[in-house]
Amino acid sequence: MSAYWIAVASAQHVRRGRNDGFMQVNHGKAAPLRRVKPGDGIVYYSPTTILGEKDGLQAFTAIGTVRYGKESPIKAKWAAASRRSGAMSNGRWLKKRRSSHCSTGWTSPLASRTGGITCASACSKSPITIFV
């Protein structure tokens, strides 16, 4: 059974991973990536364009499926840990209409085996509009 994940990262980090075929979450910590398996769905939410900036982007920036997940997290030049992934290769940028600042971090699986939804870093104060 596939799981579905919401990953939170700046748009710049999502773009780098998409271009180079890997994903990164939680400031490069490996533990969350060990839980991601081939076939899992990934949606990236970016509260900012660049890490540390407060530009209020608040957009879903990529969507896709993990292609390679059996290998352990790997080291990347610009990140502590990442996982080879096709999550960004077939994704496209999704934008929202309004903007305000929201916190970052890794979120728990969406629609997991238990069917529960847990989102540790969701910002309920500013709704997002997704264009598909």
UniProtKB/Swiss-Prot annotation:
Family in the record: Belongs to the UPF0310 family.
UniProt xrefs under HAMAP family: UPF0310
Name the UniProt record assigns to this protein: UPF0310 protein msl8638
Species the sequence originates in: Mesorhizobium japonicum (strain LMG 29417 / CECT 9101 / MAFF 303099) (Mesorhizobium loti (strain MAFF 303099))
Species lineage: Bacteria, Pseudomonadati, Pseudomonadota, Alphaproteobacteria, Hyphomicrobiales
